[in-house]
Curated annotation (Swiss-Prot):
Family, as annotated: Belongs to the MIP/aquaporin (TC 1.A.8) family.
Coiled coil: none
Short sequence motif named NPA 1, residue ranges: 94-96
KW Thylakoid (keyword) present: no
Locus of motif NPA 2: 207-209
Compartments where found: Membrane
Protein role: Probable intracellular unorthodox aquaporin that may modulate the water content and osmolytes during anhydrobiosis.
Keywords from the named record: Glycoprotein, Membrane, Repeat, Stress response, Transmembrane, Transmembrane helix
Organism placement in taxonomy: Eukaryota, Metazoa, Ecdysozoa, Tardigrada, Eutardigrada
Protein name (database record): Aquaporin-11
Lineage top rank: taxon: Eukaryota
Species whose genome carries this gene: Milnesium tardigradum
Length: 270
Protein backbone atom coordinates (compact mmCIF):
# COMPACT_ATOMS: atom_id res chain seq x y z
CA UNK A 1 0.00 0.00 0.00
CA UNK A 2 2.79 2.42 0.93
CA UNK A 3 4.57 1.69 -2.36
CA UNK A 4 1.39 2.39 -4.34
CA UNK A 5 0.83 5.66 -2.51
CA UNK A 6 4.41 6.78 -3.17
CA UNK A 7 4.05 5.81 -6.83
CA UNK A 8 0.93 7.97 -7.20
CA UNK A 9 2.20 10.84 -5.06
CA UNK A 10 3.92 12.76 -7.91
CA UNK A 11 0.77 12.46 -10.04
CA UNK A 12 -1.37 13.86 -7.24
CA UNK A 13 1.03 16.79 -6.84
CA UNK A 14 0.93 17.48 -10.59
CA UNK A 15 -2.87 17.37 -10.58
CA UNK A 16 -2.83 19.75 -7.62
CA UNK A 17 -0.56 22.11 -9.58
CA UNK A 18 -2.84 22.06 -12.63
CA UNK A 19 -5.89 22.75 -10.46
CA UNK A 20 -3.94 25.53 -8.75
CA UNK A 21 -3.22 27.14 -12.12
CA UNK A 22 -6.84 26.86 -13.26
CA UNK A 23 -8.12 28.26 -9.95
CA UNK A 24 -5.78 31.27 -9.99
CA UNK A 25 -6.67 32.02 -13.61
CA UNK A 26 -10.39 31.74 -12.90
CA UNK A 27 -10.01 34.06 -9.93
CA UNK A 28 -8.19 36.59 -12.12
CA UNK A 29 -10.97 36.35 -14.70
CA UNK A 30 -13.58 37.02 -12.05
CA UNK A 31 -11.71 40.07 -10.75
CA UNK A 32 -11.23 41.34 -14.30
CA UNK A 33 -14.91 40.93 -15.15
CA UNK A 34 -15.90 42.84 -12.03
CA UNK A 35 -13.35 45.66 -12.09
CA UNK A 36 -12.49 46.22 -15.76
CA UNK A 37 -15.22 47.89 -17.79
CA UNK A 38 -13.40 48.85 -20.99
CA UNK A 39 -14.04 46.13 -23.60
CA UNK A 40 -10.59 46.16 -25.21
CA UNK A 41 -8.89 46.10 -21.82
CA UNK A 42 -10.95 43.06 -20.81
CA UNK A 43 -10.07 41.36 -24.08
CA UNK A 44 -6.36 41.98 -23.50
CA UNK A 45 -6.51 40.69 -19.93
CA UNK A 46 -8.48 37.59 -20.95
CA UNK A 47 -5.93 36.74 -23.65
CA UNK A 48 -3.10 37.18 -21.17
CA UNK A 49 -4.81 34.92 -18.61
CA UNK A 50 -5.64 32.27 -21.22
CA UNK A 51 -2.03 32.17 -22.38
CA UNK A 52 -0.72 31.77 -18.84
CA UNK A 53 -3.20 28.96 -18.17
CA UNK A 54 -2.48 27.16 -21.44
CA UNK A 55 1.29 27.33 -21.20
CA UNK A 56 1.69 26.79 -17.45
CA UNK A 57 -0.48 23.66 -17.51
CA UNK A 58 1.55 22.34 -20.44
CA UNK A 59 4.75 22.86 -18.47
CA UNK A 60 3.27 20.66 -15.75
CA UNK A 61 2.27 18.08 -18.36
CA UNK A 62 5.97 17.90 -19.12
CA UNK A 63 6.56 16.87 -15.51
CA UNK A 64 3.90 14.17 -15.79
CA UNK A 65 5.47 12.89 -19.01
CA UNK A 66 8.92 12.62 -17.47
CA UNK A 67 7.62 10.54 -14.56
CA UNK A 68 4.80 8.46 -16.06
CA UNK A 69 5.39 8.51 -19.82
CA UNK A 70 3.33 9.53 -22.82
CA UNK A 71 0.17 7.61 -21.94
CA UNK A 72 -0.20 9.74 -18.82
CA UNK A 73 0.63 12.80 -20.92
CA UNK A 74 -2.23 11.97 -23.29
CA UNK A 75 -4.71 11.69 -20.42
CA UNK A 76 -3.43 14.92 -18.87
CA UNK A 77 -3.64 16.74 -22.19
CA UNK A 78 -7.21 15.50 -22.68
CA UNK A 79 -8.20 16.80 -19.25
CA UNK A 80 -6.49 20.17 -19.75
CA UNK A 81 -7.95 20.60 -23.24
CA UNK A 82 -11.39 19.88 -21.85
CA UNK A 83 -10.95 22.56 -19.18
CA UNK A 84 -9.78 25.11 -21.75
CA UNK A 85 -13.07 24.92 -23.63
CA UNK A 86 -15.18 26.09 -20.69
CA UNK A 87 -12.71 28.41 -18.92
CA UNK A 88 -11.28 30.45 -21.80
CA UNK A 89 -14.48 32.52 -22.24
CA UNK A 90 -13.87 34.58 -25.40
CA UNK A 91 -10.09 34.13 -25.40
CA UNK A 92 -8.39 32.69 -28.47
CA UNK A 93 -4.90 32.20 -27.03
CA UNK A 94 -3.73 31.75 -30.61
CA UNK A 95 -2.41 34.51 -32.92
CA UNK A 96 -3.04 32.36 -36.00
CA UNK A 97 -6.71 32.09 -35.02
CA UNK A 98 -6.82 35.88 -34.61
CA UNK A 99 -5.36 36.18 -38.11
CA UNK A 100 -7.98 33.82 -39.50
CA UNK A 101 -10.85 35.68 -37.84
CA UNK A 102 -9.47 38.97 -39.16
CA UNK A 103 -9.41 37.52 -42.69
CA UNK A 104 -13.02 36.36 -42.24
CA UNK A 105 -13.92 39.86 -41.01
CA UNK A 106 -15.02 38.46 -37.67
CA UNK A 107 -12.39 40.54 -35.86
CA UNK A 108 -10.93 43.98 -36.49
CA UNK A 109 -7.22 44.43 -37.14
CA UNK A 110 -6.91 46.35 -33.88
CA UNK A 111 -8.49 43.57 -31.85
CA UNK A 112 -6.50 40.85 -33.63
CA UNK A 113 -3.18 42.58 -32.92
CA UNK A 114 -4.21 43.28 -29.31
CA UNK A 115 -5.20 39.65 -28.70
CA UNK A 116 -2.04 38.28 -30.31
CA UNK A 117 0.21 40.69 -28.40
CA UNK A 118 -1.20 39.94 -24.96
CA UNK A 119 -1.34 36.23 -25.73
CA UNK A 120 2.40 36.24 -26.41
CA UNK A 121 2.99 38.32 -23.27
CA UNK A 122 1.13 35.70 -21.24
CA UNK A 123 3.25 32.96 -22.79
CA UNK A 124 6.40 34.88 -21.91
CA UNK A 125 5.61 34.91 -18.17
CA UNK A 126 3.98 31.47 -17.94
CA UNK A 127 7.24 29.66 -17.20
CA UNK A 128 7.93 31.94 -14.23
CA UNK A 129 4.38 31.36 -13.05
CA UNK A 130 4.82 27.58 -13.21
CA UNK A 131 8.08 27.87 -11.27
CA UNK A 132 6.25 29.45 -8.32
CA UNK A 133 4.59 26.11 -7.55
CA UNK A 134 7.71 24.12 -8.40
CA UNK A 135 9.67 26.19 -5.88
CA UNK A 136 7.62 24.66 -3.06
CA UNK A 137 9.64 21.48 -3.61
CA UNK A 138 6.73 19.10 -3.08
CA UNK A 139 8.54 16.47 -5.15
CA UNK A 140 12.03 15.94 -6.51
CA UNK A 141 11.05 16.35 -10.17
CA UNK A 142 9.61 19.78 -9.44
CA UNK A 143 12.92 20.86 -7.96
CA UNK A 144 14.74 19.52 -11.03
CA UNK A 145 12.46 21.54 -13.31
CA UNK A 146 12.80 24.58 -11.06
CA UNK A 147 16.60 24.53 -11.20
CA UNK A 148 16.86 23.72 -14.90
CA UNK A 149 16.93 26.89 -17.02
CA UNK A 150 17.73 25.22 -20.36
CA UNK A 151 15.68 23.18 -22.82
CA UNK A 152 16.23 21.14 -25.97
CA UNK A 153 14.19 21.89 -29.08
CA UNK A 154 11.41 19.47 -29.99
CA UNK A 155 12.09 19.84 -33.71
CA UNK A 156 13.61 16.51 -34.79
CA UNK A 157 13.49 16.99 -38.57
CA UNK A 158 14.65 19.58 -41.12
CA UNK A 159 12.94 22.95 -40.84
CA UNK A 160 10.79 22.59 -43.97
CA UNK A 161 9.42 19.24 -42.82
CA UNK A 162 8.64 20.74 -39.43
CA UNK A 163 6.92 23.62 -41.20
CA UNK A 164 4.83 21.12 -43.15
CA UNK A 165 3.76 19.29 -40.00
CA UNK A 166 2.76 22.46 -38.13
CA UNK A 167 0.88 23.70 -41.20
CA UNK A 168 -1.00 20.43 -41.66
CA UNK A 169 -1.88 20.17 -37.97
CA UNK A 170 -3.34 23.68 -38.07
CA UNK A 171 -5.41 22.88 -41.17
CA UNK A 172 -6.90 19.79 -39.52
CA UNK A 173 -7.60 21.73 -36.33
CA UNK A 174 -9.38 24.52 -38.22
CA UNK A 175 -11.45 22.08 -40.28
CA UNK A 176 -12.65 20.35 -37.13
CA UNK A 177 -13.48 23.68 -35.48
CA UNK A 178 -15.68 24.59 -38.44
CA UNK A 179 -17.69 21.36 -38.39
CA UNK A 180 -21.33 21.62 -37.36
CA UNK A 181 -21.04 18.97 -34.65
CA UNK A 182 -17.86 20.35 -33.08
CA UNK A 183 -18.09 20.34 -29.26
CA UNK A 184 -15.96 20.21 -26.11
CA UNK A 185 -15.41 16.45 -26.32
CA UNK A 186 -14.35 16.55 -29.96
CA UNK A 187 -12.09 19.51 -29.15
CA UNK A 188 -10.29 17.61 -26.38
CA UNK A 189 -9.94 14.38 -28.37
CA UNK A 190 -8.73 16.19 -31.49
CA UNK A 191 -6.18 18.18 -29.48
CA UNK A 192 -4.66 14.93 -28.21
CA UNK A 193 -4.68 13.24 -31.63
CA UNK A 194 -3.24 16.21 -33.53
CA UNK A 195 -0.60 16.80 -30.86
CA UNK A 196 0.56 13.18 -30.97
CA UNK A 197 0.65 13.29 -34.78
CA UNK A 198 3.47 15.82 -34.60
CA UNK A 199 4.77 15.26 -31.08
CA UNK A 200 7.94 13.39 -32.05
CA UNK A 201 8.54 15.49 -35.16
CA UNK A 202 7.99 19.15 -34.31
CA UNK A 203 6.31 18.98 -30.90
CA UNK A 204 2.77 19.14 -32.26
CA UNK A 205 1.94 22.67 -31.10
CA UNK A 206 -0.03 24.22 -34.02
CA UNK A 207 -0.27 27.35 -31.87
CA UNK A 208 2.28 30.23 -31.90
CA UNK A 209 1.50 31.16 -28.29
CA UNK A 210 2.15 27.69 -26.88
CA UNK A 211 5.23 27.10 -29.01
CA UNK A 212 6.66 30.48 -27.94
CA UNK A 213 6.48 29.43 -24.29
CA UNK A 214 7.74 25.89 -24.85
CA UNK A 215 10.31 26.22 -27.65
CA UNK A 216 11.65 29.74 -28.11
CA UNK A 217 15.27 29.97 -27.03
CA UNK A 218 15.72 26.20 -26.72
CA UNK A 219 19.02 24.65 -27.77
CA UNK A 220 19.16 23.41 -31.34
CA UNK A 221 16.59 25.86 -32.71
CA UNK A 222 17.59 29.24 -34.12
CA UNK A 223 15.31 32.25 -33.99
CA UNK A 224 14.54 32.28 -37.74
CA UNK A 225 13.84 28.53 -37.72
CA UNK A 226 11.51 28.94 -34.75
CA UNK A 227 9.45 31.66 -36.41
CA UNK A 228 9.33 29.80 -39.72
CA UNK A 229 8.11 26.53 -38.23
CA UNK A 230 6.03 27.59 -35.26
CA UNK A 231 4.61 30.95 -36.37
CA UNK A 232 4.55 30.92 -40.15
CA UNK A 233 3.36 27.28 -40.14
CA UNK A 234 0.11 27.92 -38.22
CA UNK A 235 -0.53 31.16 -40.14
CA UNK A 236 -0.03 29.33 -43.44
CA UNK A 237 -2.31 26.55 -42.20
CA UNK A 238 -4.98 29.09 -41.29
CA UNK A 239 -4.67 30.70 -44.74
CA UNK A 240 -5.08 27.35 -46.48
CA UNK A 241 -8.04 26.39 -44.30
CA UNK A 242 -9.77 29.63 -45.30
CA UNK A 243 -9.61 28.46 -48.90
CA UNK A 244 -10.57 24.81 -48.49
CA UNK A 245 -12.77 24.67 -45.38
CA UNK A 246 -16.12 25.54 -46.96
CA UNK A 247 -15.92 23.34 -50.07
CA UNK A 248 -14.34 20.44 -48.19
CA UNK A 249 -16.84 20.55 -45.32
CA UNK A 250 -19.67 20.87 -47.83
CA UNK A 251 -18.56 17.56 -49.31
CA UNK A 252 -18.03 15.86 -45.94
CA UNK A 253 -21.13 17.13 -44.18
CA UNK A 254 -23.22 17.21 -47.32
CA UNK A 255 -22.90 13.44 -47.54
CA UNK A 256 -24.77 13.17 -44.23
CA UNK A 257 -27.55 15.34 -45.61
CA UNK A 258 -27.75 13.16 -48.68
CA UNK A 259 -28.12 10.06 -46.50
CA UNK A 260 -30.96 11.71 -44.59
CA UNK A 261 -32.72 12.53 -47.86
CA UNK A 262 -32.39 8.91 -49.00
CA UNK A 263 -33.81 7.64 -45.71
CA UNK A 264 -36.71 10.10 -45.95
CA UNK A 265 -37.40 9.06 -49.51
CA UNK A 266 -37.50 5.39 -48.52
CA UNK A 267 -39.82 6.17 -45.62
CA UNK A 268 -42.24 8.02 -47.90
CA UNK A 269 -42.16 5.22 -50.48
CA UNK A 270 -43.03 2.68 -47.78
Amino acid sequence: MYTQIMTMYPLLISILHILFIISICQLCRYVSNVLVKHSLARIAIEEFICAVQLCATNFELGVITQIYGFSAYALGLFFCSFTYTFTFQDGTCDPSECYEKFCKREMSAREAVLRATFSIMGAAVSYRFAKIFWSFGLMATHMDFYKNESCDASLQVPVLIGLGFETFETIVNRLLQNMRHYNMLISAISDVCITFFGLFVSGGYFNPTLSFAMEYGCQGLSGPSFFLVYWFGPILGSSISLKIAKPLLRIIEGSDEAKVEVVDAKAHSD
